[in-house]
From Swiss-Prot:
Pathway: Carbohydrate biosynthesis; gluconeogenesis; Carbohydrate degradation; glycolysis; D-glyceraldehyde 3-phosphate and glycerone phosphate from D-glucose: step 2/4. The active site is at E284 (proton donor), H305, K420. GO terms for biological process: gluconeogenesis; glucose 6-phosphate metabolic process; glycolytic process. InterPro entries: G6P_Isomerase, Phosphoglucose_isomerase_CS, SIS_dom_sf, SIS_PGI_1, SIS_PGI_2. Catalyzes the reversible isomerization of glucose-6-phosphate to fructose-6-phosphate. Transmembrane segments: none annotated. The lineage of its organism: Bacteria, Bacillati, Mycoplasmatota, Mycoplasmoidales, Mycoplasmoidaceae. This is Glucose-6-phosphate isomerase. One of its GO terms (cellular component) is cytosol. It comes from Malacoplasma penetrans (strain HF-2) (Mycoplasma penetrans). It comes from the Bacteria. It is found in: Cytoplasm. Its EC number is 5.3.1.9. GO terms for molecular function: carbohydrate derivative binding; glucose-6-phosphate isomerase activity; monosaccharide binding. Keywords: Cytoplasm, Gluconeogenesis, Glycolysis, Isomerase.
Amino acid sequence: MIKLNFTNFLEGNKSTEKIFKSYASKIETLNNSIEEKKCKGASMLGWMDYPSKYNKNEIKELINVSQEWYNNKKIKNVVVLGIGGSYIGVRAGIDWVLPEFNREKEIYYVSSMSSSYVYSLIEKLKKEDFYLIVISKSGTTLEIGVAFRLFYSLLFEKFGSEGAKERTVAITDKEKGTLRKIADTQDIQTFSIPDDVGGRFSAITPVGLFAMGVMGLDVNKVLKGCAKAIEDTKEPDIEKNTAYQYAALRHYMYSKKEKYNEVFCVYEDALRFFTEHLKQLFAESEGKEGKGLLPVNCLFTTDLHSVGQFLQEGNQIFFETCISIKNPLNDVVINEFLKDEDGLGFLNGKKLDYINKVAASSTIDAHHIDGKIDIIQINLDNRNEESFGYLYSWFSKVVAMSGLLLKVNPFDQPGVEAYKSRMFTKLKK
């Protein structure tokens, strides 16, 4: 499902073959530690098992409830309260599969404490009906706790206790935590977050699957793609495992070439939030003990008009990873409305996706040939539920190996607590 292209990386395939050989033994050893669940952070490898060993009854119930919400044409709005992996991965999946406009339902995400944004959304929803999805393992995440108070109380005011709970689903811990307690007290429908799956790996669990189902995605196809990726990446031989090939090249660029930034490039607006997911995935997994590549995401050609100058001729502390989709969800033919008055007559009758792909290949040529930038290309055929699930789990295996190559625990994020503890101390004064 995934094809890697190394044509524009170092000197091409000859270079990558040498690198793969140098990493082969180390990769095999680390792969065994992952598969045998003996690696650093092994207690948080549940995302590897989930696509094939999930609770069948819970997912059946999740699909039934999400389809019921999706089929209710009277309620057009869905509000998702989540932050980090409880937001980014959810949105990445929905945006990956659905067209940007004319969706069956409008979805709004509350993932910050911007008073202006929250006020505007509340004012809109005072006049309209909406469903509410709250996602938090503990229920003590401040951003989500505050948002839940505001939006659940709005439902309560509009529809009463019964109406509010009918329009709400909580995704939280199976047994414990503040949100679990509130959901049980209020008799709110819940689905559980597995104990052994961290936030940035969790979009393939009810964390992401419920909202995806509400928006019309086929949950089973997402899980099918995930399961295939996990199976494909069990292979210990780096020559046969694209996830480990990519992990090895990332580590090589960091440790041997002193490239400390990775720029993720996409040419489709719908893929932007997948690169936001990658930003969190790699930053939280690798950024420890003074180590790690800083992930940066770019939407081309838009960002070529802002950071393009730096990428072409600036401080070359980075390499690029470009993700592309062969077949667009939809396409547009350039009309002959102005004939050649604008000097663009040579584009008459051409498809917009073709023009976009020419821009992509031209940028790759300019960056690699002229700018001497090393570029890894990740190519997929289609945007759909299965390809999203596959790529999501494929990158999860990449980051597991990447973190272990750096000799850090890829599955914790202790540094995130620093701002939280200071924030709570100040707020309680």
